[in-house]
């Protein structure tokens, strides 16, 4: 493994250097940091340097993983490849232990997109309620004790875990957290509607993520996220 070269190409920010708005890019960036494997991160400004990928991944969308000289361009396949190739005992497994962790919150981003990009003001409230219901389902999952928690505390009524599957980040978190952060950031700015404090499980989840370098370090600046959504959001 020491001789293998890993290079992750991600979207650059507006300044052309730091990490830009791209939840799939952040997802794989988090996975590699959690694996603890040496890799090179390359930010790509496709506006200023559109040909930078042409030699090994022509026409591909970011993110792209270069494993030695082999280019991989599908985010899900890259994630599966990293989990299979960089596994125990040399690297930690990031697979969740509970199947439900993989699907928790999987409808939140779709509901958010429908709400935030809605051109018809009269539909805003109905679409916002749909988003809140999706967030409430995620909140219920995050607050329900998991099997291993109940094994230690049979009387536990509400989970105290930090992430979807327990107290460590998994692939499920790498997928959901970048999108959930976008939801909170964009709704707060453009609709003055951050994820409600009453959704204690979701707020705890986001707060816990911000304490982890693998999430905090890979996050684009809020200005990057807002700039990406500004053209799609209709003023109210």
Swiss-Prot record:
Enzyme class of the recorded protein, top EC level: oxidoreductase
Domain GST C-terminal: start-end pairs: 68-235
Kindly report the pH dependence of this protein's activity.
Optimally active at acidic pH.
Q: What is its EC number?
A: 1.8.-.-
What is the activity regulation comment for this entry? Inhibited by rapamycin, amphotericin B and IAA-94.
Q: In which tissues is it expressed?
A: Detected in placenta (at protein level). Widely expressed. High expression is found in placenta followed by lung and heart. Low expression in skeletal muscle, kidney and pancreas.
Its placement in the membrane is given as: Single-pass membrane protein
Q: Where is this motif: G-site?
A: 22-25
- By its UniProt entry, which SUPFAM superfamilies does this protein fall under? GST C-terminal domain-like, Thioredoxin-like
Single GO biological process annotation from the record: signal transduction
The record's GO CC annotations read: chloride channel complex; cytoplasm; extracellular exosome; extracellular matrix; membrane; nuclear body; nucleus; plasma membrane
Give me the ranges of the annotated region Required for insertion into the membrane: 1-88
Taken from the record, one Pfam family name reads CLIC-like_N
Q: Keywords for this entry? A: Cell membrane, Chloride, Chloride channel, Cytoplasm, Disulfide bond, Extracellular matrix, Ion channel, Ion transport, Membrane, Nucleus, Oxidoreductase, Phosphoprotein, Secreted, Transmembrane, Transmembrane helix, Transport, Voltage-gated channel
Describe the location of the GST N-terminal domain by residue ranges: 12-90
Q: Is ATP-binding there in the keyword field? A: no
Q: Which reaction does it catalyse?
A: chloride(in) = chloride(out)
Which segments cross the bilayer? 24-44
Entry's family note: Belongs to the chloride channel CLIC family.
Q: What does this protein do?
A: In the soluble state, catalyzes glutaredoxin-like thiol disulfide exchange reactions with reduced glutathione as electron donor. Reduced in a glutathione-dependent way and secreted into the extracellular matrix where it activates TGM2 and promotes blood vessel growth during tissue remodeling as occurs in tumorigenesis. Can reduce specific cysteines in TGM2 and regulate cofactor binding. Can insert into membranes and form outwardly rectifying chloride ion channels. May participate in cellular growth control.
Q: What else is known?
A: Overexpression of CLIC3 is associated with cancer pathology; it positively correlates with pancreatic, ovarian and breast cancer prognosis and negatively with gastric cancer prognosis.
User: What protein am I looking at?
Assistant: Chloride intracellular channel protein 3
């Amino acid at each position: 493994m020491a001789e293998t070269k890993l290079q992750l190409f991600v979207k650059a920010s507006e300044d052309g250097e730091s990490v830009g708005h791209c939840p799939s890019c952040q997802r794989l960036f988090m996975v590699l940091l959690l694996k603890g494997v040496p890799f090179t991160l390359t930010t790509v400004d496709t506006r200023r340097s559109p040909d930078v990928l042409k030699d090994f991944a022509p026409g591909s969308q970011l993110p792209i993983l270069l494993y030695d000289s082999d280019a991989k361009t599908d985010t899900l396949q890259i994630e599966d490849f990293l989990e299979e190739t960089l596994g125990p005992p040399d690297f930690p497994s990031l697979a969740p232990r509970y199947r439900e962790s993989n699907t928790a919150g999987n409808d939140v981003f779709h509901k958010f997109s429908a709400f935030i990009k809605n051109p018809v003001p009269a539909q805003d409230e109905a679409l916002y309620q749909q988003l809140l219901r999706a967030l409430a389902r995620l909140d219920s999952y995050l607050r329900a004790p998991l099997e291993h928690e109940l094994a230690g505390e049979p009387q536990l009524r509400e989970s105290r875990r930090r992430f979807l599957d327990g107290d460590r980040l998994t692939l499920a978190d790498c997928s959901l957290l970048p999108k959930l952060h976008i939801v909170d950031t964009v709704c707060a700015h453009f609709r003055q509607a951050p994820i409600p404090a009453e959704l204690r499980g979701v707020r705890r989840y986001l707060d816990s993520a911000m304490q982890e370098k693998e999430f905090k370090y890979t996050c684009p600046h809020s200005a990057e996220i807002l700039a990406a959504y500004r053209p799609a959001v209709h003023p109210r």
